[in-house]
UniProtKB/Swiss-Prot annotation:
Record-given protein name: Elongation factor 4
Membrane topology: Peripheral membrane protein
Gene for this chain: lepA
Disulfide cross-links: none
Stretches assigned to the tr-type G domain: 2-184
GO cellular component labels: plasma membrane
């Protein structure tokens, strides 16, 4: 027990945590040099392509320290992006300490700060590490001051290393062994194991990543899931050295994987406690707080035959990603699908890509919306996550939109640009503090504006230097309206959007213009209108294609031409009554880009 160290690495995106973990694995001999490749722990193709960590991974390594002792390091890699902060809090729950990795050139960023506070709230020992000291732009002294000033932990003797060149990585390991406390727990008490993560394997069923808090788990034991009371057999268990290695037992304080041949996806939920069936523990371990999705979007399979496969895929994915929420939904335009809740737009993109790649599905996504709180005239309060569920205007007493509290850290020279952006997004400044050359800004901005494209625009106005962390603050009454799109007089539910009354005419006009470019021309005119209630605010027409019926007439009487034109006109009229308009996938995505052109 005293030689076990459980830790994770927290850092902002691109501050080098995956590279540092590669070096740690190499030094401890977890993989032979032949098997070593860059970013070993980012095993998903998607993670490698985008260069970000999405899933938390765990590795168990043996490290022979300078004091002659051999320590078992259980190391859990965590993502750095704001949309995956839930993964981080799950990983931290299994640790006693964390390495706070900060880029010695860039300094502290908002995300580092948020994850660091999460770690401190859980009473973890935070060990600061200054990475990338081999870069010419590195200024470790300034960054150490910044860490002390902004984060408030002592950093003057922070370990300095360069994960890329391998300089100072052994110092990191020595400091880790010295500063991070060993796990607490009673090896003789009844078994209590916390499920940190689980995923679905086609051959083994559900595989769970567990942290043993008390007692010992042995192969072949009967194991009980505390929330459901189901009993399973521990068929296989072991550790990752990044490869799966079988063991006969997992001892108190260790982190490892477990296979119990659970075929039911909901058999072992994340955050649940496992105990021995023979000698069960009295109470479950405190799990994780459930996260509320911030962004909702409808996902529909392109062909309705894929619905079953889509449902299974979502089930398997939600096992692996506990922050994904979904419920069935049907749309008149798109058929049957699911309404899914995500933590942010990046999360939504990643889930959609994983569904398309790993499960081979073709999907249509509707525009993302946030949850609104609506008080009806009969004084009941309902929560609306889709524009089509919004009650009629005359039944709404008050519509409240979610407000996000945004913490931004940025260099002083970009302050003006960022403030302009926040004001444009209907933001209200609540705080501003200067730390050396950095400024910490706090704004309250409507969640709908934040999730749409705020992050991208913040990055572009500040040349990538500003960083953002946001969380839900409260609901606030606001003058929001629903803009409907009518095509040939029929409402298309999948194209509706909720927007602020002041922006509605611009958004409506822009949407109608975009639709006009995307809908292919037919044999008859297609009228595209944007409406608030019964009030039309914008209109555009996709002109018909027409055959020149007068081509065969040479000269002759005008009544002959009139007759032909009249005949054509009647045909078009009849066609318009029965004709229906096919909307291409791009049309549904056009809503995403409304308001992007800085309007």
């Amino acid at each position: 027990m005293k030689n076990i160290r459980n830790f994770s690495i927290i850092a902002h995106i691109d501050h080098g945590k995956s590279t540092l973990s590669d070096r740690i694995i190499q030094i401890c001999g977890g993989l032979s040099d032949r098997e070593m490749e860059a970013q070993v722990l980012d095993s998903m193709d998607l993670e490698r392509e985008r260069g970000i960590t999405i899933k938390a991974q765990s590795v168990t390594l043996d490290y022979k320290a300078s004091d002659g002792e051999t320590y078992q390091l259980n190391f859990i890699d965590t993502p750095g992006h704001v949309d995956f902060s839930y993964e981080v809090s799950r990983s931290l729950a299994a640790c006693e300490g964390a390495l706070l990795v900060v880029d010695a050139g860039q300094g502290v960023e908002a995300q580092t700060l948020a994850n660091c506070y999460t770690a401190m709230e859980m009473d973890l020992e935070v060990v600061p590490v200054l990475n990338k000291i081999d870069l010419p732009a590195a200024d470790p002294e300034r960054v150490a001051d910044e860490i002390e000033d902004i984060v408030g932990i002592d950093a003057h003797d922070a370990v300095r290393c360069s994960a890329k060149t391998g300089v100072g990585v052994t110092d990191v390991l020595e400091r880790l062994v010295r500063d991070i406390p060993p796990p607490e727990g009673d090896p003789d008490a009844p078994l209590q194991a916390l499920i940190i993560d689980s995923w679905f394997d086609n051959y083994l069923g559900v595989v769970s990543l567990v942290r043993i808090k008390n007692g010992t788990m042995r192969k072949g034991d009967k194991i009980k899931v505390m929330s459901t009371g189901q009993v399973y057999n521990a068929d296989r268990l072991g550790i990752f050295t990044p490869k799966q290695v079988d063991r006969t037992e997992l001892k108190c304080g260790e982190v490892g994987w477990l296979v119990c041949a659970i075929k039911d996806i909901l058999g072992a939920p994340v955050g649940d406690t496992l105990t021995a069936a023979r000698n069960p523990a009295d109470k479950a371990l405190p799990g994780f707080k459930k996260v509320k999705p911030q962004v909702y979007a409808g996902l529909f399979p392109v062909s309705s035959d894929d619905y079953e496969a889509f449902r299974d895929a979502l089930g398997k994915l939600s096992l692996n990603d506990a922050s994904l929420f979904y419920e069935p939904e049907s749309s008149t335009a798109l058929g049957f699908g699911f309404r899914c809740g995500f933590l942010g737009l990046l999360h939504m993109e990643i889930i959609q890509e994983r569904l398309e790649r790993e499960y081979d599905l073709d999907l249509i996504t509707t525009a993302p919306t946030v949850v609104y709180e609506v008080e009806t005239t009969s004084k009941e309060v309902i929560y609306v996550d889709s524009p089509s569920k919004l009650p009629p205007l005359n039944n709404i007493q008050e519509l409240r939109e979610p407000i996000a509290e945004c913490h931004m850290l940025l260099p002083q020279e970009f302050l003006g640009n960022v403030i302009t952006l926040c004001v444009e997004k209907r933001g209200v400044q609540t705080n501003m503090v200067y730390h050396g050359k950095q400024v910490a800004l706090t704004y309250e901005i409507p969640m709908a504006e934040v999730v749409l494209d705020f992050f991208d625009r913040l990055k572009s106005t500040s040349r990538g230097y500003a960083s953002l962390d946001y969380n839900f603050k409260r609901f606030q009454a606001s003058n929001m309206v629903r803009v409907d799109v009518l095509i040939n007089g029929e409402r298309v539910d999948a194209l509706a959007l909720i927007t602020h009354n002041d922006n509605a005419p611009y958004r409506g006009r822009e949407l109608v213009e975009k639709m006009k470019d995307l809908i292919p021309r037919q044999q008859f005119d297609i009228a595209i209108q944007a409406a608030i209630g019964n009030h039309i605010i914008a209109r555009s027409t996709v002109k018909q294609l027409r055959k020149n019926v007068l081509a065969k007439c040479y000269g002759g009487d005008v009544s002959r031409k009139k007759k032909l034109l009249q005949k054509q006109k009647e045909g078009k009229k009849r066609m318009k009554q029965v004709g229906n308009v096919e909307l291409p996938q791009e049309a549904f995505l056009a809503i995403l880009h409304v308001g992007k052109d800085g309007k």
